[in-house]
Amino acid sequence: MNIKSSQTLVSEALKEIKTINTDEALTLFNEDKCNLIDIREKGELDKMGRVENSNHIPRGMLEFWLDPDGPYFKSGKLDMNKEMVLFCAGGLRSALAARSLKEMGFEIIK
């Protein structure tokens, strides 16, 4: 069995998505041009805090909550016409999540 490493998956994702820095993400968010999505787990939010007015969608639920045809879709939670800016603690999970949403058809900025 040949298993890809998580680092390989992240490296591949980073080749397919656009990344921006924190200042660029906050500028887009403050100008109301994107949905700022925190994909960290609840325990991380409790420990490290959160960006005010950002949307919290845990990584494990992201695709389910954003699938309009799925039973877990969170209608009205996000403006589905805006770009999705995802962030986590270190950028690895958000890279994989951005790639997944890109595959679903979303316009993504990490």
What annotation goes with each model-predicted range?
Residues 1-52:
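Flexible, polar/low-complexity N-terminal or interdomain linker segments that lie immediately upstream
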Residues 46, 64, 95-96:
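Alpha-helical elements of the RecA-like P-loop NTPase motor core of helicases
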Residues 52-53, 71:
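Short glycine-enriched, charge-decorated loop/helix-capping segments at active-site entrances
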Residues 70-110:
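Catalytic cysteine-centered active loop of the rhodanese-like fold, especially the PTP/DSP P-loop
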Residues 64-70:
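Short, charged, surface-exposed secondary-structure boundary motifs
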Residues 38, 55, 87:
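Active-site-adjacent beta-strand anchor residues
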Residues 55-58, 62:
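Thiol-based oxidoreductase modules, predominantly thioredoxin-like and allied folds used
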